[in-house]
Amino acid sequence: MSDGFGKIGFSGTLRPSQVASSSIIRKELESGSRELLIVAPPGSGKTVLGLYVWSDLVRLPTLVLSPNSAIQAQWVERAKELFHLDDRESEIGTDPENPGILTSLTYQSVTLPKRGGGELDESAMELWISSLMTPDLNDGSVEADDRESALAWIADLREKNFEYYSDRMGHYRKKVRDSLSEHGNALWILHESAKANLKRLLEVGVGLVILDECHHLMDHWGRVLIEAMEFLGNPVVLGLTATPPEGASNSSVDQYFDLFGEVDYEVPVPALVRDGNLAPYQDLAYFVRPSPGELRYIANVDEDFKSLLGELKGGAENVKGRTPKLEVWIARVLDGLILPAGRAKDWNSFHRRDPRLADAARAYLASGELNLPEGVPQPSAELVAGGNSMDVLITILDRYIRNGLMRSESEEDHALAEDAKSKLRMLGVQITGGGPRLCASPVGRVMAYASAKYDALRDILRAEMETLGPDIRAVIVTDFEKTSATALVEGVLDDDAGGAVAAYRAVLGCESTDRLDPVLMTGTTVLVDDDLLERIFPRFEQWVSERNLNIKFDYIERGGYFEIRGKGKDWLPRHYTMMITEMFQDGVTKCLVGTRGLLGEGWDASRINVLVDLTTVTTSMSINQLRGRSFRLDKHWPEKVANNWDIVCLADEFTKGFDDYLRFKRKHKQLYGVCDDGAIEKGVGHVHAAFTEAEPEGVSETMEIFNEEMLMRARNRGRARELWGIGQPFNAVPREAIEIKGSFGEGFPPANRIGLVAWSDESLIQAIGDAVACSLQALGLIRFDAKVGGGSRGGGWMRAYLEDASEEESEIFAEAMQEILGPLDNPRYVIPREVKVVSETWLSEMLPKVIAKYFRRSENILSMYHVVPSKLCRNLEDAKVFEQQWNWKVSPGEVMYGHSKKGKEWVSEIKMAGLAPKSSFHRKSVFT
């Protein structure tokens, strides 16, 4: 686009995903597009892609904006390392006062708002006054009747509690700034330094703005940048992110797409792994139980909840002015179709106005075998089955508290309502004027920061050390440096439970893991193992000296470790993060402990091969950034496979005993992973087939077995790498799959062949799948090149799905497999399955094994009956097609009609004889 760039250009070779992305960008630029958005995971080379757009495509002065100084510096480092700059290195930098052909800044540098100022403070004061005079939405109360009393209220607060006054003033300043930026005055609210930076960039003639980690632009930054782009003359805008908007408000999403338009190109993680551009990985989980003290606390909270239910169920009865007990109140509400705004005219109207109450109330009464009022429809079996679930109870209790107890004339009912609300808060439910809301739960906190997690951490590290030896590079990530216990859990959790310091002490507290020479680094603190100090301290001083940084080091002994102190203008997180990361890469320390704020977005250490996630964060943005740390290729270990660990606390006998598992499930909602059968799955099921969307099946009873299986997987990185199928293409179209758990594999295939291998669940389900697929092909329901994939998922679970098929075809196959391996529920046709049973004879017992197999006795016996899938038995002719395939691949046998009187009796006898399948199923979407 411009000749002013001379010989500046990329001096390397783009990866396949970068070639694909850049070709899309080139076409968009040629068509006149000025808004571009590329979505790609951490480690996929977004920085190089952005620089390539600068140097080879746009070739105009460029501004790069990043969320923090570490990422800001990386752009300049990559440009100088990988690009031919035609001796113009001096025009590339991070100084906002000296912009050049490539200027890398933080978002804050051009969006910093005013901290005060006459006009802003005046507007904030007016907004505060207005809020004091506005009736409360819940009860209609007001703090001030007129302007004078509002001003007096604020003046009194300023005099008596200046700290709180300042806090509220800051709150209203922010509201004013947000309002101004939303309505087209974003630049007016900027700090003078931000305005000056924008003016200098305008003078330099910025033609391209690269917005890195642009998922941050949903609020203030995004609103300001929309106007800033206009101020800069509408340059080309390139957004780079691993996580596009998810679950944000409509206005925020609209603002985001005003900047970028729709996604131009998205690169899924599995595609990059299979292309060899990201390291393969496996997600692993280790389960623990709360300690005895923690269990007592959880049990007490549970007991309080049960006593609350008992109190509400046994409440006042026929007492004037009192709200009746829970069941009576619910029945009266349903009988009278009573809602806070008045009675509904009929059931349909009642259900439409409050469907959650209508369904929960019916389910609750029916599950307790209580009669429903006349005219109220009976609930479905599914609703009744969940009649005592937490979802139903919370809905019932919320309406009873808000519409019953709190509207009562009785102060006793009011007190009961407050007691109920406080006990529900312990379980993470807050009853508000608008209904129940999730809130931080003390029980959830105890589960998240359970002390047993530190024992698990040491078990994991020991297993990884045994496998990796001196090549281990472990990173442990927590939410915060220290996580102080709240008053509600004081005495249950240690003072710093859940924090980086606690995890660090846990690693030091074991002789074997202490040999990792761990280092802790957060935004404010650096701690070094006492065994490591003599070796690492000179390295620190050398590193600083080589870079001419103004830093003087000191250290303080803390008992088993040292705190590193630094003085000088360059003692900043971005400098010591780079320094310690380099020591980690070189193996001076083999374990880093830190917070997600520092070791998450933008942090880069390619040698990580063990990541232990002790955070409680569940948003896809944070999770993708965190997990992306371990995906990077390691030039020192081309066969690298990273193990990403979660530690999950379970206490399933209690009401909130699955809280930590639900958090684990949310973490994995948007994560891809490879499964035991080589399929790629998004969601928690890729970690193990027993981990379902509802709850982990059978984990509590066999926790040690699950943990040992996970440790075995951790040791077998070669198998994980093989499962990823590196070099194979990735198909981003999801396939419907069926997972089955049952006891099917017994005996031998009933064929007249010698030396056959006995059926296993895996081989039998594969054979049944082949029979089903071939039948569907013969009837023209699926394409002929489709084939059955799948295999063992561990824990007794098998999976089957259709490869090289459309979404519709894969769904047809999965449904057919669930029918044929499922119960005999009113089947149209059934078919028997025989197996061959082999027994020894007196002669076979005397002969060598190689010869004995020819003299063993064998006979076919009936093993089970199966439903003929509905798609394969629309008529007898179709059923005979299936019968033929079944006979070839599975067993001899004829289809039999089950809808006649005789057939129904016969099916009933089969069930009574225990010859029907008894299976559990999961339906999943997988990628191949």
Predicted regions and their residues:
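A conserved SF2-helicase RecA2
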Residues: L272-A279, A605, T618-N624, F631-M712
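Walker A/P-loop
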Residues: S31-V53, L217
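Post-DEXD/H (motif II) to motif III coupling segment of the RecA-like Helicase ATP-binding lobe
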Residues: H216-L278
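Non-catalytic terminal extensions of ATP-dependent helicases
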Residues: F5, I38, R425-M426, G434, ...
